[in-house]
Amino acid sequence: DRLAASYAYTGLERLAGARAVFPDAPAMVASGSLIDEGMHAAVALLDQHSEITAIIAQSDLLAIGAIQAAEERGLTVPGDLSVVGFDGARVDGLTTRTLTTVVQPIAEKGRAAARLALGALADARDGELRDQLFTSILRVGDTTGPPRES
């Protein structure tokens, strides 16, 4: 349950970030982070909003699923639809594409988690255990391009 709750919280946080930039864009949060779930979410989104020109997925695996769903519909990526993932995970063998993705600072996050865990073990005060902010980078691949013309 904690993993599911943690994943849901992360998905909602990522959605809130996208909403801050694109407040009127249609959105949905997938229940997990598998390629099949990305396909199902993309199919639902494209069924309801055929006019969309881009999908920002909450993980790289969901993005791969969105690409597969788009291509099964005869859409080209990035010609008809741009797709961006989130994580910067290695997806070798899962797609022939070079995914455009937001790369998380994994090593920095790991060090921060270790510091927090050590602080908790040392009976740190709650005030010392605080939210951490990290800077991610956009790694541009071949799954994004200019929006198609209407």
Please name every model-derived segment.
Residues 1-150:
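Bacterial carbohydrate/catabolite-sensing allosteric modules
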